[in-house]
């Protein structure tokens, strides 16, 4: 599985020389959302690679009607305009992208769960401070919306043109849904980054060098005080840091 190999290599690179990774473990096994990242991310990588291969073929194809063959002086009416190859893969891509958000939200949930030495909700004062609780709510809402958006558009069809166009791909609907899934997923991942940085502020041990640099850069350049700033602003800061630099 090429995607799994890629995902595992990324994790090894990120955690290289981490002070936390080699620490003694009390738990026999981690939850799937941590332990199975290479398998889940890898499957999405492979799915997206397939989708891109189909899109590349489509970009280099004749997708019009009629088809004109200049050398043969022939014009043939056909169906190359039909967008089924795009519709199916756009739906598939939405499912693949949504899985990044699905597993990310589970990790965010565990980060605020008050386990493994971290305070509940990563709150500074338990009982009077809701910490990152609302951030996890937002991630859960994004993931839930993605599930609705991943209902395939390509299984739908409606008749038009007086019955002449009696099977259509709905590829445009699949494309607009994919764009929304991508945006939701980017926000869910930004919430995980924000939550992870809040957790790192609690820890004394350092993670891998490159990740530690990014963590330090983010917390030093942004006010992460959730008690004085709206959570929306913190999430927006994280989104901009992750995706718009």
What are these regions (language model features)?
Residues 1-245:
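C-terminal auxiliary extensions adjacent to catalytic cores
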């Amino acid at each position: 599985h090429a995607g799994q190999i890629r995902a595992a290599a990324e994790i090894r690179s990120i955690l290289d020389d981490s002070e936390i990774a080699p620490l003694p473990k009390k738990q026999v096994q981690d939850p799937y959302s941590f332990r199975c990242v290479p398998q889940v991310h890898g499957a999405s990588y492979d799915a997206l690679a397939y989708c891109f291969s189909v899109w590349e073929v489509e970009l280099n194809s004749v997708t019009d009607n009629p088809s004109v063959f200049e050398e043969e002086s022939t014009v043939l009416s056909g169906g190359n305009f039909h967008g089924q190859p795009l519709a199916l893969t756009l739906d598939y891509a939405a499912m693949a992208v949504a899985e990044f958000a699905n597993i990310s939200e589970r990790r965010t949930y565990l980060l605020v769960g008050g386990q493994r030495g971290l305070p509940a909700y990563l709150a500074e004062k338990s009982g009077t401070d809701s910490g990152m609780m609302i951030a996890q709510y937002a991630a859960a809402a994004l993931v839930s919306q993605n599930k609705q958006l991943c209902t395939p558009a390509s299984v739908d069809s409606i008749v038009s043109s007086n019955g002449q166009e009696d099977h259509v791909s709905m590829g445009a609907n699949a494309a607009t849904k994919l764009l929304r899934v991508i945006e939701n997923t980017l926000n869910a991942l930004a919430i995980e980054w924000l939550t992870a940085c809040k957790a790192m502020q609690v820890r004394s041990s350092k993670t891998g060098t490159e990740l530690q640099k990014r963590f330090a850069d983010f917390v030093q350049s942004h006010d992460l005080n959730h008690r004085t700033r709206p959570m929306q602003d913190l999430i927006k800061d994280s989104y901009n840091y992750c995706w718009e630099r």
